[in-house]
Design a protein with these regions (language model features):
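RNase H-like, metal-dependent nuclease domains and their acidic two-metal-ion catalytic environment used
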Residues: 1-157, 163, 167, 180, ...
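Short, surface-exposed amphipathic charged segments that create phosphate/polyanion-binding patches used
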Residues: 166-175
């Protein structure tokens, strides 16, 4: 039995990671423009260490019933050249396109991110229903957003929590039930994303095993989780509300 267990573990480790979604499949869902005005939306935050990339994603349901999505990244302003060299991409191009924001100095300015989030309703003409976040590095920001009148929900980045949203996002893309506007940085994040399986065979995006930055994909999965719970499953009680 021990031999079989060890043998199975070896096999399992051999197929531990796999590509999440092919970029070519994601690109099939690209549209020229999304009409956000009047939509109810859910936000997902992935606030990593202040020296690393952070991301905010917004999702909702379009008039055609498809999931509509937008995602932006935040990086330390004084580390642009360093990150360009290390990651072999041009962050200045993404900043010019409005899909990435450089803030702070050597570290990301959380206050900038908080202000950005608080301006989303006015900028897009949407109504923010909920904001999902992971407790790690985000508790202070979540409390500030709560004080500003937003409903924030802690969404643990565990496979047992996010596997359903991970699957929904994948299936929505593969079935062309997903739309996003031109966003090269998001596509790069999807290209970097690698998945693993938990002991219960729950599939999840594995940051440590991924081939580069995946913060935009992770924040989108968190937002999709809220959308799934509220719209597709109709559940009202979930997560841990902060307040």
């Amino acid at each position: 039995e021990n031999f079989i267990t060890k043998h199975c573990n070896i096999v399992y480790q051999g197929v531990e990671t796999e590509t999440y979604i092919a970029v070519s499949d994601v690109q099939k869902c690209k549209v020229k423009k999304i009409e956000w005005a009047g939509k109810e939306v859910y936000l997902g935050l992935d606030l990593a260490m202040t020296t690393d990339n952070c991301s905010d994603s917004m999702v909702g349901v379009g008039d055609n019933g498809k999931i509509i999505a937008e995602s932006v990244a935040f990086i330390p302003a004084d580390r642009i050249d360093e990150k360009n060299k290390l990651e072999h991409i041009d962050y200045r191009r993404f900043i010019k396109a409005g899909k990435c924001f450089a803030c702070g100095n050597r570290t990301v300015d959380y206050e900038f991110i908080e202000k950005y989030i608080m301006q989303i309703q006015e900028r897009y003409g949407v109504k923010v229903i909920m904001i999902g976040f992971d407790r790690y590095n985000c508790l202070s920001t979540a409390q500030k957003l709560e004080s500003a009148g937003y409903q924030t929900v802690e969404v643990n980045q565990m496979s047992s929590v996010l596997h359903g949203a991970t699957k929904l996002l994948e299936e929505s893309i593969l079935n062309l039930n997903f739309e996003y506007e031109q966003n090269d940085l998001l596509e790069i994040n999807f290209g970097n994303a690698r998945c693993s399986y938990s002991a219960n065979m729950n599939r999840y995006v594995n940051k440590k095993k991924s081939n580069g930055k995946v913060d935009m994909v992770v924040s989108m999965i968190i937002a999709i989780y809220l959308l799934q719970q509220n719209i597709f499953l109709g559940e009202e009680a979930f997560g841990v509300q902060i307040g």
